Amino acid sequence: MSDTPQSEPRRSDDRSGADDATAAAAGSTDAAAAAVSSKTGGIAGPPGGPGEVDGDEPAVARTVGESDEQLQDAWTDYEFDGDAKVSVSDLDTYYGEERALESVSLDIPAESVTALIGPSGCGKSTFLRCLNRMNDRIRGARVEGRVALDDRDVYGDGVNLVELRRQVGMVFQEPNPFPKSIRDNISYGPRKHGDLETGLLARLLGRDDRDAERDLVERALRRAALWDEVNDRLGDNALGLSGGQQQRLCIARCLAVDPDVILMDEPASALDPVATAKIEDLIEELAEEYTVVVVTHNMQQAARISDQTAVFLTGGRLAEYDATDAIFQNPQSQRVEDYVAGKFG
């Protein structure tokens, strides 16, 4: 096994990322630490515990002098108040015979932002896609272990994938609005689920209103901080929006089906700094109501927006999971310290 990231596995239907959208719709350590300090008032995280990270696979980057024995145990005993919204136990994921994730276990708290960081090819996007079974769409993908949403195994018998992806929405790296009007982008998901036709939407909104679609569109766009910018051109093609507006539209499209969890795979990596700041502000606002899980290569961004951070290292193993301030100010393994310091990645 080499450190070179594997090529992207092909989807089972060889379709583009737009089809994933359709399915989903139905730094430096100093800068990162500064962001944490600003967010937490300069308070360091909890004192560390025993914790050298796992990862005795040859492909896993390690600090000179660390032995296999020292790399046995990951520091992932992160404790938080309340129940887990998502609970992952002993998760292994394969593409054909190649293992992409190995023995990953962690609990994700509700109404918070969890960041997933690590070098390219470490498995963080694979992990994200396991949470709503988007990996089912990739040829040869196989998942072992347990992923529970509100204590129900999403890989168990009788799981309705359409309903699962409604509960666990996804926003992708590249903005991918449908080539339809802004209005139709928002109403696509509820129409697909039959909400507009059955009156479920009106009940969700707490009102019996014939203008349910209009209310839905406005509500979703307001939640995504986009309404004031587009309310006078809802009939325009969404492809005419700026990149940042398109990404917020995709977030609004996700919100329109009333999810519990929102997955974001590098949602700001293709955007300029101004648009990125708007997305970051939006993520923090969404966490007041939703459980948000974000993959990012930008460690400063992870430090700014997240409550807890999971660090994956090459080989698909979880190296460390803790409160974000602890990860950046007091990491429990040398490898994680080296990674957040930019010594490899």
UniProtKB/Swiss-Prot annotation:
Q: Where is the ABC transporter domain positioned along the sequence?
A: 86-340
Q: What is its main location?
A: membrane
Instruction: List the lineage, top down.
Output: Archaea, Methanobacteriati, Methanobacteriota, Stenosarchaea group, Halobacteria
Which Gene3D superfamilies does this UniProt record tie to the protein? P-loop containing nucleotide triphosphate hydrolases (3.40.50.300)
- Where ATP binds, per the record, is at 118-125
Task: Specify the protein name.
Answer: Phosphate import ATP-binding protein PstB 2
User: Its gene?
Assistant: pstB2
**Record family assignment:** Belongs to the ABC transporter superfamily. Phosphate importer (TC 3.A.1.7) family.
Q: What is the E.C. number?
A: 7.3.2.1
Keywords, sorted A to Z = ATP-binding, Cell membrane, Membrane, Nucleotide-binding, Phosphate transport, Translocase, Transport
Composition bias type Basic and acidic residues, residue spans: 8-18
Q: What does this protein do?
A: Part of the ABC transporter complex PstSACB involved in phosphate import. Responsible for energy coupling to the transport system.
From the UniProt entry, list the residue stretches annotated as the region Disordered: 1-57
